[in-house]
Each structure stands twice: as C-alpha cells, then as structure tokens.
UniProtKB/Swiss-Prot annotation:
InterPro entries: PPE_C, PPE_dom, PPE_sf. Belongs to the mycobacterial PPE family. PANTHER family: GLUTAMINE-RICH PROTEIN 2 (PTHR46766:SF1). It holds the Pfam family PPE. Gene3D superfamilies: PPE superfamily (1.20.1260.20). It comes from Mycobacterium tuberculosis (strain CDC 1551 / Oshkosh). This is Uncharacterized PPE family protein PPE14.
C-alpha cells in the first residue's frame, strides 16, 4: 500500500483506532510458555534416554531405541528455540506498533488544522489571511508527510517481525507398518509357544497323566476341571497314561502321586505324609525284611480306625479352601480355636534299628524301624487331629466324644532286647 497517497486523516485515524499492541504482547507471552515447556521436555526426555541406555538397559535393543529417540530430543530442542524466537518477534512487532503510534500525528491535531484553515478562508475577504492560510497548509503538508513516513517505517518493522523460520514436524521414529509387524510377531510367538508345549507333551510316555486326571476328575472343582481340559487338549495321549514309579527299599514310589500330593495340600510335610501312607511297613514272616503292605491297615495295640482311602489308594481325598474362617455360633474365629486336642495315651521314641533276630512285638506297629519313615505313622494322623480324619473309628467312643473329635495317638514303644520282658 502506498501510504503517501493517503491524507493524514486516514493514516492517523487507522493508527489510533486499531486494537493496539496488547494482542501481540499476549501472543509473545504464550510463545514464551510454549518454549519453556518444550525446553523442559527436551531436557527430561534426553536425560531419561541417556540414563536408560547407560545404566540398566544395554544391547542392540537399547541402541535401536536410542537411535529412534535421539532425533526426537533434537526436534524438541529445535522447536523450543523456534517458539522462543516467535515470542521475540511478536514482542518486536508490538514495539514497532508502539513506536509508530507515538510518531503518528494525533487525529485531533489534523482536525484542528483543517478547522483553522476553513476559518481563515472564510474571513479572507480582502486577502489579509493569505499568509495564515499558507502557514496552515504547510503545517498540514508536514502532517501528511509525517504520517506517511511513520506508516512506511511501521510496515517495514512489521514485515521483519513476521519473518519466521517454518516449524518442522517431528521425525518419524517408527515405520507405518510397525504396529502391524508387532502384532504379527506377537501372534507368531504365541503360536510358537503353544507348538513347543504340544511337542514337549507329545514326547512324554503314552498315558503319563492318566492317574492324575482320573484321580482329580472324581472330586474336581471348576478350576481343576478347567486344568484337566487344558491338559487333555494339549496332549491327546493323556487318556492312556501309565504310572511312573521309582524303586525304593520299601517298594515302588509313584512319582505322579507324590507330585499331586505336594501341590494339592497346603503343607509339604502333610503332602509327603499323605503320599507315603499307602506304603505300610511290616515284616514278611520270619524273613526279617521290610516291604510294602499296601492295602492292609496298620497293626497296633491302639484301636486304629480303618482309613478312608482316597482315589490313589492312599490319602483321603484332598480338599482345600481359602478365606473361610471357623465358626463358633455366628462368630468367625481362627481354626486353631476349634481344634480338638488329641487324647494322648503314650508316646516314646522310635524303635531302634531293626534287627532280623529280634522278635516283633505285636504292639510295635509291625516292628517298624527308625529311619526315613519311622515316624510316618504319627505324622499321618496330623491331618486327622485337625480335620476329624477321613474314616470312622471302629468300636464305641468313650467319654461321650463323637467319632473323629479326639483321634487317638498311635503308641510307639521301644523294641525290648532279646530275653528281656517287654516294658
């Protein structure tokens, strides 16, 4: 625009009727805030990346992450500098407006000059006001020139303030096909894991898990049923499973039964106890040897109840519960408050090492020797002392106690030396 063609009334009116520099100052403050936030983000981002790849994370993955993240840190810093420059330029534009506003002739002076000129012209009958009229016109010309110069200068300053380098978008750190590739890799990894699990189960001997499934199927809760279904799906040979046993001095130990007992009970000690209960220890006639007598109850001087054999031919069916307290009326109490104390008759140390020449005392639990399973008879009653046992007691209960409320303690006596009467 050619401001020299416009009279001072127009230029001065435009300058004085505008919104002023307040909007430019507000924009400068906003850009300062953006620059500060970007600078803080760049410093924090760079610190996190450098700390992550230097201290806890090293290797090709860390190098790839650093290569993808470092350009973004640079972009944040560069954008922060651009925002700061934008704020400076907005502030410069506001200053340019202030300078132009101060140099512009006020519209009131222009109006006064025009009013005085009209008065002089109206009173100039004989030409006596010619000099005053010329001076007024000269003053008006100066106003015209001053406003034009101010507007030209303001135009140049505004153009310089608005010249900003363009903002660039951030560098693309990932490829467009990255999410699809990640999803495909995850799906492939899951399929590979399932295939590996199926291959591992297929290498097991045929029917290795049949005892587990048949034992748990009878009293399976919803969780156990779900696990059985998963096992059957992963390995179709489960249905024809055969037990795996380990030879021991007292017979063959079922590994699967031991595993089930160890994971199905809340105590490892009770798990081992309940697993070993089917292998009773006794004498084979006069041979003096030890061997399993599975399926026969212990012989003891006490009236031992017939056990309630579980699905393995050993421990009672396993059951477990979580979050259920014992009740005394309507009051929830710890389980130890309701445990009936066993009726202690006699308890001594285990018998010494068995000698083939020693006769078996009929009250000594078939002459069970000290050793790995010497105290297993007492330990097998640990669960019965707290849960009431899995079987029923033969005979009539005494002292008005119900069956299973106070299970007796098995009596273990020392084996007397040869020739001495039993104690």
């Amino acid at each position: 625009m050619d401001f020299g063609l416009l009279p001072p009334e127009v230029n001065s009116s435009r300058m004085y009727s505008g919104p002023g520099p307040e909007s430019m100052l507000a924009a400068a403050a906003a850009w300062d805030g953006v620059a500060a936030e970007l600078t803080s983000a760049a410093v924090s981002y760079g610190s996190v990346v450098s700390t992550l790849i230097v201290e806890p994370w090293m290797g090709p993955a860390a190098a790839a992450m650093a290569a993808a993240a470092t350009p973004y840190v640079g972009w944040l810093a560069a954008t922060a500098a651009l925002a700061k420059e934008t704020a400076t330029q907005a502030r410069a534009a506001a200053e340019a407006f202030g300078t132009a506003f101060a140099m512009t002739v006020p519209p009131s002076l222009v109006a006064a000059n025009r009013s005085r000129l009209m008065s002089l012209v109206a009173a100039n009958i004989l030409g006596q006001n010619s000099a005053a009229i010329a001076a007024t016109q000269a003053e008006y010309a100066e106003m015209w020139a001053q406003d034009a110069a101010v507007m030209y200068s303001y135009e140049g300053a505004s153009a310089a303030a608005s010249a900003l380098p363009p903002f660039t978008p951030p560098v693309q750190g990932t490829g467009p096909a990255g999410p699809a590739a990640a999803a495909a890799a995850t799906q492939a990894a899951g399929a590979g894991a399932v295939a590996d699990a199926q291959a591992t189960l297929a290498q097991l001997p045929p029917g290795i898990l049949s005892d587990i499934l048949s034992a748990l199927a009878a009293n399976a809760d919803p969780l156990t049923s779900g696990l059985l279904g998963i096992a059957s799906t992963l390995n179709p040979q489960v249905g024809s499973a055969q037990p795996i046993v380990i030879p021991t001095p007292i017979g063959e130990l079922d590994v699967i039964a031991l595993y089930i007992a160890s994971i199905a009970t809340g105590s490892i000690a009770l798990a081992i106890t309940n697993t070993a209960r089917p292998w009773h220890i006794g004498l084979y006639g006069n041979a003096g040897g030890l061997g399993p007598t599975q399926g026969h109850p212990l012989s003891s001087a006490t009236d031992e109840p017939e056990p309630h054999w579980g699905p393995f031919g050993g421990a009672a069916p396993v059951s477990a519960g979580v979050g259920h307290a014992a009740l005394v009326g309507a009051l929830s109490v710890p389980h130890s408050w309701t445990t009936a104390a066993p009726e202690i008759q006699l308890a001594v140390q285990a018998t010494p090492t068995f000698s083939s020449s020693a006769g078996a005392d009929p009250t000594a639990l078939n002459g069970m020797p000290a050793g790995l399973l010497s105290g297993m008879a007492l330990a097998s009653l640990a669960a019965r002392g707290t849960t009431g046992g899995g079987g029923t007691r033969s005979g009539t209960s005494t002292d008005g106690q119900e069956d299973g409320r106070k299970p007796p303690v098995v009596v273990i006596r020392e084996q007397p030396p040869p020739g001495n009467p039993p104690r």
